[in-house]
């Protein structure tokens, strides 16, 4: 299978691409700056430069490709909501349309469990109502991107698959350390739970969506087996005391931040290789 990956310099992509190559896939990478992925070229990846906002620049990279794995995204900036929406919605739409025109058969898109709000009174399932006007730009931009892809699936029969990632960590990813200061900035409750997923299981889920038949137009959550409280997470880094207020009101929604992974398990046979944060910590896989 010939696969084009975007976002190869990001947290997920920089770990996913080497694993694809090690498994013998024919991998191409679309980047804006080829110098940032020279190590992947040494491993055998084909490097193409292009811009998601310039459809003509995408054509060489898409020629002969069987499937696209679209990982590129603009995450939290707190200052550039417009840029987040442009990258995550318009960039995704442009790439998908170019891929369809180029004859690509499958398009796998990484979204986020942050598309879910609160008040579901259970772990969030893929068919929950989400708010397209979510004030969080990252969340609303991912919802909009999902909608654009599903529209292409309905109108053109394009085989799109959407994977909503829980909080991704592991493989020396600094994501946890970077996020702990945000718990205080965003006034998060210490008892709030967060669902996590190790990079190994992101890879596992992406490969399942890449290779399995009969998943056209489907959306899946991916997470591990054991959500963890924000307090526990901060405490494991010695940061709990300076992150949370000593006095807190009761937690309003104990299910906020938790997702239901039963669909992915039933449809694909997915089972997390790293079932919890504590397993990863004890096995030195953080």
State where each predicted segment sits:
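NAD(P)H-binding glycine-rich loop region in Rossmannoid oxidoreductase-like domains
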Residues: 35-41, 45-89, 98, 118
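N-terminal Rossmann NAD(P)H-binding glycine-rich loop of SDR-like oxidoreductase domains
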Residues: 3-23
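NAD(P)-dependent short-chain dehydrogenase/reductase
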Residues: 151-201
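C-terminal amphipathic/interface module of NAD(P)-dependent oxidoreductases
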Residues: 242-286
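Mid/C-terminal beta-alpha module of Rossmann-like enzyme folds, strongest
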Residues: 2, 205-261
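Catalytic helix-loop patch of NAD(P)-dependent Rossmann-fold dehydrogenases
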Residues: 120-162, 188
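Glycine/proline-rich active-site loop of Rossmann-fold NAD(P)-dependent oxidoreductases
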Residues: 143, 155-158, 168-179, 208-220, ...
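Conserved Rossmann-fold NAD(P)-dependent oxidoreductase catalytic core, especially the SDR/UDP-sugar
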Residues: 93-137
């Amino acid at each position: 299978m010939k696969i084009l990956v975007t976002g190869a310099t990001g947290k997920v992509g920089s770990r996913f691409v080497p694993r694809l190559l090690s498994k013998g896939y024919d991998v191409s990478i679309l980047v804006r700056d080829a110098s940032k992925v020279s190590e992947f070229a040494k491993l055998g990846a084909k490097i193409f430069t292009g811009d998601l906002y310039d459809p003509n620049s995408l054509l060489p990279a898409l020629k002969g490709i069987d499937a696209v794995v679209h990982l590129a995204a603009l995450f939290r900036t707190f200052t550039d909501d417009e840029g987040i929406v442009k990258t995550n919605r318009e960039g995704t739409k442009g790439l998908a349309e170019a891929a369809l025109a180029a004859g690509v058969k499958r398009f796998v898109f990484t979204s986020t469990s942050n598309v879910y709000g609160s008040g579901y009174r259970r772990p969030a399932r893929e068919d929950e109502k989400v708010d397209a006007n979510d004030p969080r730009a990252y969340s609303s931009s991912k919802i909009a991107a999902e909608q654009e892809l599903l529209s292409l699936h309905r109108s053109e029969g394009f085989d799109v698959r959407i994977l909503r990632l829980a909080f991704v960590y592991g493989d020396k990813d600094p994501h946890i350390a970077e996020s702990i200061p945000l718990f205080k900035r965003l006034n998060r409750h210490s008892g709030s739970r967060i669902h996590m997923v190790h990079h190994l299981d992101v890879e596992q889920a992406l490969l399942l969506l890449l290779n399995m038949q009969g998943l056209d137009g489907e959306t899946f959550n991916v997470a591990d087996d054991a959500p963890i409280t924000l307090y526990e997470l901060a405490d494991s880094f010695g940061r709990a005391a300076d992150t949370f207020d000593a006095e807190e009101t009761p937690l309003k929604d104990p299910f906020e931040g938790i997702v239901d992974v039963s669909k992915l398990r039933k449809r694909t046979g997915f089972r997390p290789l790293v079932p919890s944060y504590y397993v990863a910590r004890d096995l030195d896989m953080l």
